[in-house]
């Protein structure tokens, strides 16, 4: 279903018992409000790197929370995107109304792409490790990451 097809999302949602996620191509809390009010999705999936950063993510999570809709960040890109998503979910309150089945009930979650990706696998000085379905939240200042300047230069576009 293309992102702008709200009715298509609703048809998919009504035809399945599986929770429907969407919104990775939506950029604002106002856009997510349309998805949620129309009953298009069970899980809002904002991409923090394209939807206005951590501040807009918090706004989206607030709107979703009013309607009892779960929020799980869409993460498809660099190690910086993973760090931003980890920071976002670490700051979120537990969500008791989630549509996700146990054992994930109330656990903060994010999408974690495992396809080969040099911007995810090479860009950071220390990579994130997915172990037992968990990723450690960095405890350094900011996003808690350091960029490898040589790798950044390697992928620089003029």
Model-flagged regions — what are they?
Residues 3-22, 26-134:
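Shared catalytic-loop signature of beta/alpha-barrel
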Residues 137, 149:
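Active-site and glycan-interaction determinants of carbohydrate-active enzymes
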Residues 139-141:
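C-terminal hydrophobic helical "lid"/dimerization subdomain
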């Amino acid at each position: 279903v293309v992102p702008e097809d709200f009715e298509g999302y609703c048809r998919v949602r009504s035809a399945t018992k599986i929770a429907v996620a969407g919104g990775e191509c939506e950029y604002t809390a106002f856009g997510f409000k349309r998805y949620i009010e129309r009953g298009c999705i069970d899980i809002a999936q904002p991409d923090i790197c394209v939807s206005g950063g951590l501040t807009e993510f918090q706004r989206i999570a607030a709107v979703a929370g009013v309607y009892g809709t779960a929020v799980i960040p869409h993460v498809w890109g660099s190690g910086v995107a993973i760090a931003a998503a980890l920071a976002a979910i670490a700051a979120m309150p537990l969500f008791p109304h989630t549509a996700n089945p146990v054992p994930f009930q109330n656990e903060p979650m994010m999408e974690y792409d495992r396809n080969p990706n040099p911007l995810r696998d090479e860009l950071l000085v220390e990579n994130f490790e997915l172990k037992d379905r968990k990723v450690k939240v960095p405890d350094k200042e900011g996003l808690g990451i350091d960029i490898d300047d040589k790798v950044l230069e390697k992928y620089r576009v003029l």
